């Protein structure tokens, strides 16, 4: 769902930022 996609995007951004 959209929420799952949003969570994946946020997770990816966090991964890149190292947060």
From Swiss-Prot:
GO terms for cellular component: extracellular region. InterPro entries: Aurein_antimicrobial_peptide (IPR013157). Expressed by the skin dorsal glands. Coiled coil: none annotated. Its main location: secreted. It holds the Pfam family Antimicrobial20. One of its GO terms (biological process) is defense response. Keywords: Amphibian defense peptide, Secreted. It is found in: Secreted. This is Uperin-2.6.
């Amino acid at each position: 769902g959209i929420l799952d996609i949003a969570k994946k995007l946020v997770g990816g951004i966090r991964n890149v930022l190292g947060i």
